[in-house]
Regions:
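Short active-site loop at a secondary-structure junction
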Residues: 149-155, 168, 177-242, 278-287, ...
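Bacterial N-terminal signal peptides that target proteins for export
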Residues: 2-12
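Catalytic loop of the DD-peptidase/beta-lactamase superfamily, centered on the K-T-G motif
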Residues: 25-30, 134-168, 311, 316, ...
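C-terminal motif of bacterial Sec signal peptides marking the signal peptidase cleavage site
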Residues: 20-22
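Alpha-helical scaffold elements that line and support the substrate/ligand-binding pocket
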Residues: 158, 162-163, 188-211, 243, ...
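Catalytic-site signature segments of enzymes, centered on catalytic residues
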Residues: 231, 252-331, 356-370
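Active-site helix/loop module of the DD-peptidase/beta-lactamase fold
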Residues: 188-191, 204-250, 300-340
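Beta-rich interaction/scaffold domains
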Residues: 25-136
Length: 480
């Protein structure tokens, strides 16, 4: 290339560069920047620095788009400043009103929605804030338990010296409608129903209407008229006491099988056609069937249906009215009852809780259960509904009984578990298990009693939900 061509080429490049600069017109106006489409929210809290009446900060516990948070009892949730992190350029609103982190006071007295909109306006994400007053330490234990075991709703109550000292509702009683759990929310009790049955039996006993050592079946038995005298060998030796202690002798349990037969038909089949595996009174083998028979005894002896007798006697004595027999169908759920959520492919509405009412079909609130506990705990502030001798009989551990492995067994009384080495502070207690249900209540040796009710149950084999729930209750009781 000759020198003239080089000069022409250089001149062309120089001219082209000037044209580009001229078209840019200062540069910033036409350079396109990429705006963020992120719409996340994190680090939600109520900081002491942002709220003058708070002595300590409260941090939210997040599960997906759901955030649980507790502030002390004396903090007004109607006007509290939240702190949170959102992407640069994104905006947040509550009820359509803009909210700035660490600046805007908001009302969190009810379920609150925070909507985060991305910088470019193309994405928005909603977060649900469930704020409540309470003890952040106690509630933190409950939140951790809920997240670990995927439980939508939990209710907890604690009493000390026969007075309720703490109660709280956590999460949703009904997820779809976002109905919140309260201490008045009704939950299925599952096997905690057995204590309702036990108390009804104790009431009949104290009224002189029932002998604990009376035979149940066969000639002269309490239920002779209902089930005749043609019973299997030794069935006529089964007593009320044996049924209360799970030592009736049956190895099979027909209560939670899928069948259209009535309770009377199932009882008749068991006593007339199913041989006992163990001698009555000799061997502990947990039996829902036995407690359903006790429910039948209550109705026959009292002349009233099971729920009516409980309400007119045991519950009336305790001044409570919010305990009922539950319903099988979701559509028949009471207005203040939670919905139950199965896990692991389990159907939370697959069990016949109406048939099994005396063994596992009752519903109640934590608030009512703590009131009831005050009448059966040997306390001095609230008069017990039974004589000390009756309570002693009900709470005395098994004697001269073995388990199905042939080892001495003393961990059950009459309708109550007792003497568990892992829970030395608990005098008596009982839990409950059904699909969609996990429950526990405990009477402690120092009269700090407690109850936990859940509307779901995890079947994850990598963790023990019951052990976690029991330890959580024990830890909460230890704070009082």
């Amino acid at each position: 290339m000759n020198s003239i061509s080089i000069k022409k080429h250089f001149a062309f490049l120089l001219f082209f560069a000037f044209v580009l600069v001229g078209c840019a017109g200062g540069g910033d106006d036409i350079i396109e920047t990429s705006e963020s489409s992120s719409a996340s929210l994190s680090n939600f809290s109520f900081k002491k620095a942002d709220n003058a009446d708070m002595s300590t900060s409260s941090t939210g516990v997040t599960s997906g788009n759901l955030i649980y948070i507790t502030v002390p009892e004396d903090i007004n949730l109607k006007s509290i400043v939240p702190s949170f992190s959102i992407p640069k350029g994104a905006t947040a609103t509550i009820n359509g009103q803009p909210v700035e982190s660490s600046y805007t006071p908001c009302d969190f007295t009810s379920t609150t929605k925070i909507v985060v909109t991305s910088q470019n306006g193309k994405a928005a994400k909603s977060y649900t804030i469930l704020a409540k007053n309470g003890d952040p330490v106690i509630d933190g234990l409950v939140y951790s338990f809920m997240l670990k075991h995927d439980v939508p709703g939990v209710s907890v109550a604690i009493s000390k010296d026969e007075e309720t000292v703490y109660k709280g509702g956590y999460g949703f009683a009904v997820v779809d409608s976002e109905q919140r759990v309260t201490p008045q929310t009704l939950f299925r009790l599952a096997s905690m129903s057995k204590q309702q049955t036990t108390l009804a039996i104790m009431n009949l006993y104290e009224a002189g209407l029932l002998d604990i050592n009376a035979n149940v079946f066969g000639k002269g038995g309490i239920l002779e008229q209902q089930f005749g005298t043609n019973v299997q060998a030794n069935v006529d030796k089964v007593t009320v006491k044996h049924l209360l202690q799970h030592t009736g002798g049956w190895a099979s349990d027909p209560i939670y099988i899928s069948a259209s037969t009535t309770l009377d038909q199932r009882i008749a089949d068991m006593v007339q056609n199913k041989a006992l595996k163990y001698a009555p009174g000799s061997t502990y083998d947990y039996s829902n069937f036995g407690f359903c028979v006790l429910g039948k005894i209550i109705e026959v002896v009292s002349g009233k249906d099971y729920e009516t007798y409980l309400k007119e006697t045991v519950h009336k004595k305790a001044g409570i009215s919010n305990i009922f027999v539950g319903k099988n169908d979701l559509l028949e759920r009471r207005s203040n009852e939670c919905q139950y959520y199965g896990q692991g492919g389990k159907n939370a509405y697959g069990n016949n809780v109406e048939l099994s009412k005396a063994a596992g079909g009752m519903i109640a609130s934590t608030e009512e259960l703590m009131k009831l506990m005050a009448y059966i705990d040997y306390g001095t502030k609230v008069p017990d509904m039974f004589k000390k001798e009756t309570l002693d009989m009900m709470y005395t551990p098994l004697e001269n009984v073995v388990n199905t492995s042939g080892n001495s067994y003393k961990k059950y009384a009459m309708g109550w578990r007792t003497e568990y080495p892992n829970y030395p502070d608990w005098a008596t207690f009982h839990g409950g298990t059904l699909a969609g249900v996990a429950t526990i209540w405990a009477r402690s040796n120092d009269n700090v009693n407690g109850v936990v009710l859940c509307n779901s149950r995890s079947y994850d084999t990598s963790s023990d939900m019951d052990a976690d729930m029991w330890h959580m209750l024990e830890d909460i009781q230890a704070m009082f």
